[in-house]
Curated annotation (Swiss-Prot):
GO biological process: positive regulation of translation
Protein name: Elongation factor 4
Pfam families in alphabetical order: EFG_C, GTP_EFTU, GTP_EFTU_D2, LepA_C
Enzyme Commission code(s) on record: 3.6.5.n1
Domain of life: Bacteria
Length: 660
């Protein structure tokens, strides 16, 4: 690991400007820095020319915990380098999806090519091309971050000067260290009244192993210190290495689907060069394509003459099949191509599974096409067809976490205009039956009948960082979720890091919400897979009129089975409309009933037409009704409306939350 050295960065290179004057100040600064005395336009045009010498290129990304200001800092960099004019500028410029902008989070990593002219030091006045990749911060999108890091030589580690180091800060730091990237530590949001940069600079320096004076101070909101940061990127991040005269090798680090142009593939060129109209080959599949367009993103796509060593850009081949462009694959020339592929990415393993079903069964082909397209944009998504007795045809989908699941469903509904039902999320279990055969269960309906010998569930190593005053309540919560304490460290007298090993099934519902509520929102959580462990798990079936409804079945720990059964039977009693006959709602483990509620019958008034007369006439009508209800109860079916499914399944986690 290469640590920051050289000049101490404590003084700030620009005064803080008030909110109202921020845009003009940045615009003036950008024009002053990027326009020479004889130029009428900013020299951003030099970055539009490709085949830049590798010594003039710097590839870096911004990594941080969620909501520490990555996208806002990227906005200031876009303004400062002049690639976005004032009229086009908007907050979170690189966050292209509506969901990202509404929630204020980054989901997809975005790359952009920036021009920069260094203002001081031995490189003063020299022009450089910076490739910036803005990455997500949430634990569910760690795979996006790891792919972005593969395309870089350096990383800006951003920490909120008012909140300090959090769990995902450490997780992203370790990802960058694994790839031997240059780390530039930066404190953001120094303009906040609650900011304490001196304290958190010490924390950051302690973790990285540098001096507190080596930590840069910036404000993504006002633009303060951003120019100095870009100078430091040029000075500290090494240029890309590669052989210009070697056969072409380029790594696919992302791809998107464009409805008009087909698959758009984002690559980082490692060796050789790539030009339009040449034929390329994918080394994993051997498929060949003709390049229709090669270009750069600055920050809008711009066609170019090609890409050279170390450059990042996009390729368009006109291919419509989303499976032809696999993230992690190596692109080479169809003629005289490279013999050895680049090291690809580790395939992400889904940690949470859920069923997605169209409300209208005729939308099933549309759902399949939508998942195919989304799979190209989201390499971590997996899915396979499945059928449910209650919900019809759908897909069993694998996700990296609950937020990933929620975002995927929302994108399917918005971008492809689908109405969907999602079943309760659950994890992957390994079940050993009595006869020694082994099956993998991702769906409660796959759980074997009869006795099982052993069950293994996935476990994760969790890292929780919180104020030390909340240690007691955090430990109580983790122990109630079958967690085992692995260690505890004080980052400072006020902040503590707790490490637990916990079953993944215990944290995928409402663990994070419970953690936040117990710590007044101050705790942060990160987790990574840590193998599996033996567990006492059972399948709880929900029976309506004696028939199991597969959509409501769940795999839970033996100690929690009774609570789950009670919760679901009570909820369904409220949600399912009353019938002409009494309907028992039961929860069962195998043949043993553990909870029961009755949905009372609707009483039809058969005596309404009798205005008097003989009591035997009334008794005859009542006996006839009684016989009819008895017959209906034996042959009648209970139809559960779609609204009840949606309410029961979506409120599953919320029900847990309210009871704690």
């Amino acid at each position: 690991m290469r640590l920051p050295a050289g000049r101490h960065i404590r003084s700030i290179d620009a005064p803080i400007v008030p909110q109202s004057g921020r845009a003009d100040t940045l615009d003036t600064l950008a024009n002053r820095r990027l326009a020479g005395p004889d130029q009428e336009i900013p020299i951003s045009s030099f970055a539009d020319k490709t085949f830049t010498a590798p010594a003039q290129i710097r590839n870096f990304c911004i990594i941080a915990h969620i909501d520490h200001g990555k996208s806002t800092l990227a906005d200031r960099m876009l303004q400062l380098t002049g690639v976005v004019d004032e009229r086009s500028m908007r907050a979170q410029y690189l966050d292209r999806m509506d969901i990202e902008r509404e929630r204020g989070i980054t989901i997809k990593a975005q790359n952009v090519r920036l021009p920069w002219q260094v203002s001081g030091g031995e490189d003063a006045g020299k022009e450089f091309v910076l490739h910036l990749i803005d990455t997500p911060g949430h634990v569910d999108f760690t795979y996006e971050v790891s792919r972005a890091l593969e395309a870089c030589e350096g990383a800006v580690l951003l920490v909120d000067a008012a909140q300090g180091i959090e769990a995902q800060t450490l997780a992203n730091l370790y990802l960058a260290l694994d790839r031997d990237l240059t780390i530039i530590p930066v404190l953001n949001k120094i303009d906040l009244p609650a900011a304490d940069p001196d304290r958190y600079a010490g924390e950051l320096a302690h973790i990285i192993g540098c001096e507190p004076d080596d930590v840069l101070w910036v404000s993504g909101k006002t633009g303060e210190g951003v120019a100095r940061l870009l100078d430091e990127v040029v000075r500290q991040v090494p240029p890309p290495q590669g052989q210009a005269d070697a056969p072409l090798r380029a790594m696919i680090f992302d791809s998107v689907y464009d409805i008009y142009r087909g698959v758009v593939t984002y690559v980082r060129v490692v060796d050789g060069k790539i030009t339009p109209r040449e034929r390329i080959a994918m080394m994993s599949t051997g498929a060949t394509h003709e390049l229709l367009e090669v270009g750069i993103v600055s920050p809008e796509p711009k066609a170019s003459d090609g890409l050279g060593v170390g450059e990042v850009g996009y390729l368009i081949t006109g291919v419509k099949d989303v499976r032809q462009s696999k993230v992690g694959d190596t692109v080479t020339s169809a003629r005289h191509g490279a013999q050895e592929a680049l090291t690809g990415y580790r395939e992400p393993k889904p940690m949470v599974y859920s069923g997605l079903y169209p409300v209208d069964g005729s939308d099933y082909p549309d759902l399949r096409d939508a998942l195919d397209r989304l799979r190209l944009n989201d390499a971590a998504l997996t899915y396979e067809p499945e059928t449910s007795v209650a919900l019809g045809c759908g897909f069993r989908c694998g996700f990296l976490g609950l937020l990933h699941m929620e975002i995927t469903r929302e994108r399917l509904e918005r971008e492809f205009d689908l109405d969907l039902i999602s079943t309760s999320p659950n994890v992957v279990y390994r079940v050993i039956k009595e006869d020694g055969t082994e099956i993998v269960v991702t769906n409660p309906s796959d759980w074997p009948e009869g006795k099982v010998r052993t069950v293994y569930e996935p476990v994760v190593k969790t890292t929780i960082i919180a104020p030390s005053e909340f240690i007691g309540t955090i430990m109580e919560l983790c122990q109630s979720r079958r967690g085992e304490l692995g260690g505890m460290d004080y980052l400072s007298p006020e902040r503590v890091e707790l490490r637990y090993t916990m079953p993944l099934g215990e944290i995928i519902f409402d663990f994070f919400d419970s953690l936040k509520s117990r710590t007044r929102g101050y705790a942060s959580l990160d987790y990574e897979e840590a193998g599996e462990q033996e567990a006492q798990l059972v399948k709880v079936d929900i029976l309506l009129q004696g028939e199991a409804v597969d959509a409501f079945s769940a795999i839970v720990h033996k100690d929690a089975a009774f609570a789950y059964g009670n919760k679901m039977t009570t909820k369904l009693k409220e949600l399912i409309p009353r019938q002409q006959f009494e309907v028992p709602v039961q929860a069962a483990i195998g043949s043993k009933i553990i909870a029961r509620e009755n949905i009372r019958a609707i009483r039809k008034d058969v005596l309404s037409k009798c205005y008097g007369g003989d009591i035997t006439r009334k008794r005859k009508l009542l006996e006839k009704q009684k016989e009819g209800k008895k017959r209906m109860k034996t042959i009648g079916r209970v139809d559960v409306p779609q609204e009840a499914f949606v309410a029961a399944l979506s409120a599953d986690a919320a029900g847990d939350k309210s009871k704690k």
